[in-house]
Curated annotation (Swiss-Prot):
Keyword tags: RNA-binding, Transcription, Transcription antitermination, Transcription regulation
Lineage: superkingdom: Bacteria
GO CC aspect terms: cytosol
Any Pfam family hit: NusB
BP GO terms, sorted: DNA-templated transcription termination; transcription antitermination
Organism (species): Exiguobacterium sp. (strain ATCC BAA-1283 / AT1b)
InterPro entries to which the protein is assigned, alphabetical: NusB-like_sf, NusB_fam, NusB_RsmB_TIM44
Protein name: Transcription antitermination protein NusB
Length: 128
């Protein structure tokens, strides 16, 4: 599984966990749909969930004139996963993480979602 596909599947999994209230194992099984799992995919899902409180706190600090609960589910999920990747996956350059997150936001959402994701993640790396 390529990293882009792993990110897409991780977004789908995290979305299912939040919106459908599926258990982690059920959401993984649903997203993989019979495909073999991937270590990077698993790292994104489990890592995002393990660090979700810290990630959400950082997102709240960097959302200008927005509240986290007012974001769309897709945008919130992408921001959480990308923030995890920025903070905890040191082998991937920040610009790659941000570009991938923006593309995912455009793919799952729209152009405005991409702009929002780009702005918030840009603020996070400026802080770093």
């Amino acid at each position: 599984m390529k990293r882009h596909e792993a990110r897409e599947k991780a977004i789908q999994t995290l979305f299912q966990i939040e919106v459908s209230k599926l258990e982690v194992d059920e959401a993984i099984e649903f997203a993989l749909d019979g495909e073999e799992s991937d270590p990077f995919y698993e790292q994104l899902v489990t890592g995002t969930l393990e660090h979700i409180e810290d990630i959400d706190a950082l997102l709240v600090e960097n959302l200008k004139n927005w509240r986290l609960d007012r974001l769309g589910n897709v945008e919130r999920t992408i921001l959480r996963m990308a923030t995890f990747e920025l903070l905890y996956v040191e082998t991937i350059p920040e610009n790659v993480t941000i570009n991938e997150a923006v593309e995912l936001a455009k793919s799952f959402g729209d152009e405005e979602a991409g702009k929002l994701v780009n702005g918030v993640l840009g603020n996070i790396i400026k802080e770093d």
